[in-house]
Amino acid sequence: RCCSGGGCKENEEKTKDKGQKEKSREEKSKKEKKMKRVRKQRKLFIFGLILLLIGCGILLYPHILQKFYKIKTESMFRQFEETTENVRDANPEKYARLYEEMKNYNEELIKNNQENLADPYAYANPAIRLEEYGVEDGIAGYIKIPVMDLELPLYLGANEENMSKGAAQLTETSMPIGGNNTNMAVVAHRGYSYAKMFREIEKLKIGDEIFITNFWETMTYKVERIEVISPDEIDKIRIQEGKDMVTLVTCHPYPHNYQRYLVYCERV
C-alpha cells in the first residue's frame, strides 16, 4: 500500500541515516583495527630494534673495552717514558742503584741455581720494590709483540693484581735488563673482556721479534722455539748457560689451563 508522500520520504531518510551510521561504524571499526595493527607492528619493530641494539652491544662490548684499554696503555707507555727520562735526569744515582740491584739479583739466581723456582708462593712477591725508587705505578717497562698487535705494561711479580693489568715477570727468574746467563719468564693470562693479553700467542712463529723496554733501553728478542708443557715442568723456564733470553708463558689450550704454552726468545 502506498503511503503518503511525506511519510515515504521520512522513511527513506531514516533508512538512509541508518545505512550511513552503519557504514560509518564499519569504517570506524576498520580504522580502529588498522590503527591497532599499525600500533602492534610499531611495537614489534621497536622491540626488534631494541633486541638488535642489545645484540650489537653484546658483540661490540669486548671490542670497545679493548679499544679503551689500548688507548689507556698507550698513554701509560708515554707517561712511563716521560717519567723515566725526567726522574733519571733529576736523580741518576737512584736509577743507577736500581740497575745494580737488578743486576745483583740476576747474578744471585745463577749462584743459588734458582733454588726457589719450585716454590709457587715465591712467584707472586716482587723481588724488588720499585716504589722505593720513585716508581709509584709499579711498571718496570713494557713488552711489545708486533705480530700480535700487542703492547702490555710489565710488572715485577706474577700476582693476580699485576696480571689483571698486564704482563708480569715471574719472580725467581731474571729481571728485565738482559745480559749473559739470563732468562726472564714473562707471564700473562689468555685475556679478559677488556684486554686480549696473550690470547693470540699462537700467532708467534719462529723468527718473529718481540721487544722489551725497561728504564734504560729497548731490547730486541727473536723467537727460537715453542713448546707446550705441563704446569709442573718448572725446569723448562730455568736460565740457560751463556744465553740472554725471554720466555713467554701462558695457559694452554685456550680457554682451559691444564697445560702451559712457552715461547722461547733469544736476544738479537
Question: What annotation goes with each model-predicted range?
Answer:
Residues Q41-F45, L51-V268:
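Solvent-exposed, non-transmembrane regions of membrane-associated and secreted proteins
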